[in-house]
Amino acid sequence: MRRDLDRLLNEGVNLHRRRFVTGLSLGGAALGLQPFGLLAGRGNEPGGTTLQGRVFNLTISQTAVNFTGSARVATTVNGSLPAPVLRWREGDQVTLNITNLLPETSSIHWHGIILPSAMDGVPGISTGFNGIRPGETFSYRFDVKQSGTYWYHSHSGFQEQTGLYGAIIVDPKEPEPYAYDRDYVVLLSDWTDEDPNDVYAKLKKLSHYYNNNERTHGDLMRDLEQKGLSTTWNERKMWGQMRMSQRDLSDVTGFTYTYLMNGKNPADGWIGLFKPKEKIRLRFINASAMTFFDLRIPGLKMTVIAADGQNVEPVTVDEIRLGVAETYDVLVEPADNAAYTIFAQDIARSGYARGTLTPHLSMTAHIPSLDKVANLEHRDMGMSMHHHMDHGMPDAGHSQPNMPATMDHSQHNMPGAMDHSQYTMTDRIKQMAPNSSDFSTGPVNHAATEYGPHVDMLSEDPQYRLDDPGVGLRNNGRRVLTYADLRSLHTTRGHPDPDREIELHLTGNMGRYMWSINGVKHADAEPLRWKLGERLRINFVNDTMMNHPMHLHGMWSDLESGDNYFLPRKHTVIVQPGSRISYRVSVDAEGGWAYHCHLLYHMLGMFRTVIVS
């Protein structure tokens, strides 16, 4: 990377190969010697430009940038970070000609877009697609069958971490259900000056390398004063036995990350203009590699109108947690001639991205302080609240216990897969209220492949916690959006009941930085084989203390939220630590599909290939 940077800075920037924002002069900024935020446009053009139409020509290349005072090399589209906003129209066929000027293979995945497998952009998994080799052009062509807010990013190596991501807006062919005066993309991301390969290597050697919020002697003294010696001792003993940290909230933090909003660092900040009493649509996109953001606009209520591009019944909140790869659309209506800060702090409270909604460029708003760092609780370990703190977790290396007869894996052809393919759900659903969801609160079973040194935690009592805002947001005095608030704007009454269900456990060993599904990493796992036309119920159990944003390519995930008549539709679902969650999938897309945790440094292990035939 250093050699690439020297080449770019010494040779200058070839604008034929690395196109900067239209109209930028060949000065210091063009050489990457100024903060790259200067290259980004204002308003709804976070990457400096919005491209609209049916045919798009995009070039992937290396571009010199500077977010921190040190020049680095980014992976960009048309010389822009974020990449240009792509604006499509529902019902159109779009063609995207992607030219790769990198010295390595690249790709682009259209996140949340329903399209043929061959156009999905995952090398080695998407049907017939092996990536875009250096110097080559690949043409994506597909019909746009949906509307809403989405995004695109590389699915090759760590290119997403180095800048290859951008927003997609799909305008509906029918009139929108909501009126607004302004329309802004607010794209959040995380940037590191380090080579992502070095970041990953450090995590493999010391998983908490970037955690600067470990508990201190001062925390111990406060606990002794507030909880007493016995409770404090038992609590500390429990965490010590598990060799886990109560503040293990995020693998990579502000210790190395600079958090960006529309390509602007916190010092510069993004700016969106408005006139008082205008209604503004904000399209929030979490395009980060590893960061969960907790977002609020002090002084303004946000009315959520869409989740992952799909319209939902309006719900008014103060704060939203954006998991990696999620999108939320909100409406805000500033009544006063005043400025407001868009404040997005990371889940570990190590930094923030920010922007300003303002009537005038000269007006600024107060920037809030970071919230206090939260501690993980019993519920985040999948433990019952009455669990005695003197009970240590099982030794990760203990022998496999006798499995109940119902968990006989001898007939399974997938390592560790709990595919109840012969289990019909008709009787269960008939016993439920006509429009209610079964939240799978029964006993949890662990596959034989979960036992061993590669898995350091098993949830004993994972709960379905749709109404839990999550660690750091509980009881904070603000109205926080939860999945329980999401209700589809359109009925799902006619959707069929599931034919069968599959249980997937999210597993890992934090100390060794090993991630897997059902205790099996992707390289050792057989594909999940689904039948075209069937309706599945996916049950996730999180056997780790991390949030995992699970993304299924090519098909919608209908979240079981309590009302089967209005199931919210998502492309990325957050599985909270020590919890369980379920959704329904109509298997309507033939071919090969990726299914994975969207935390970039988890993806090598917590990943499955899905084959639909």
Question: Positions of the model-derived regions?
Answer:
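Signal peptide processing junction and immediate N-terminal pro/mature segment
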Residues: F36-N44
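Histidine- and aromatic-enriched segments that form or immediately flank copper-ligand environments
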Residues: R3-L5, L51-A179, D251, T256, ...
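Predominantly extracellular/luminal regions of secreted and cell-surface proteins
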Residues: T59-S61, L224-Q241, Y483-T507
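N-terminal export leaders
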Residues: H16-L33
